[in-house]
Every structure is written in structure tokens, then in C-alpha cells.
Design a protein with these regions (language model features):
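An extended, acidic
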Residues: 1-115
């Protein structure tokens, strides 16, 4: 969270506020309601977290509104996997603008490089 806080201050935001409740659909909708905002899940090897049905409708809304929705590599969400319904393999990212999305992807990139 410290790196996200630092990025927020660099982008001239007053800081961050975290929401630690709600499911994937609600968290994505809150991004639209609370600009500037983001909701993300970094990729992980474990089969857990949200499934495609948790993200499909909100991804459609974000695309129609021209708001950022992608995985951590800036690719479209993989909503038609044959091997699993889980979205853990590439992560998810919803952001109210490109600058926030780029910062979250940069933080993820740095974290995975240091492993």
C-alpha cells in the first residue's frame, strides 16, 4: 500500500482510501462512483478469487463507457477460458483513468521483477 500511496501523491491526489469489503462486481462499480479510483487483483497461481461471472458485466460497462478494464498486461479480460472460470491467472484491473491504470501496472511490474 505504501507504493500505491506514493503514486497517488505523485499524481497529485490527497492520498488513498481502501475498501476491504464487497465483491468483484460491487468493487468495480465503486470505481465508477468514486473517481479517481481503481480496483485490481494481481495475478496469482492459486485457483481462487473471482470467476468470470463476477467480472463480465462490469467489464462490459467499463468498455461501453470508455473506462479502463484489463488484465495486468493491458490485455482484455480472459472471460472465455476453457480450463477454468477463475480470473486469477492474469489478474484484473479497473481504473477510472489511464494514469491510475498505468501506475498500478507499473507497481505490479516492479513487484514481479523483484521476486
Amino acid at each position: 500500500l505504501a507504493e500505491i500511496e506514493s503514486s497517488a501523491l505523485t499524481m497529485r491526489f490527497s492520498g488513498i482510501s481502501t475498501i476491504m469489503y464487497g465483491g468483484a462486481a460491487m468493487n468495480a462499480c465503486w470505481v465508477l462512483e468514486n473517481h479517481p479510483a481503481c480496483y485490481f487483483k494481481f495475478p496469482k497461481p492459486q485457483l481462487s478469487g473471482g470467476s468470470l461471472w463476477d467480472f463480465a458485466a462490469s467489464a462490459c460497462l467499463f468498455k461501453e463507457m470508455g473506462v479502463v478494464v484489463s488484465d495486468m498486461q493491458s490485455k482484455s479480460l480472459d472471460l472465455n477460458r476453457a480450463d477454468s472460470t477463475f480470473m486469477n491467472h492474469r489478474g484484473v484491473l479497473y481504473a477510472s483513468n489511464d494514469e491510475i491504470a498505468d501506475q498500478i501496472k507499473l507497481i505490479y511490474s516492479k513487484a514481479t521483477r523483484n521476486k
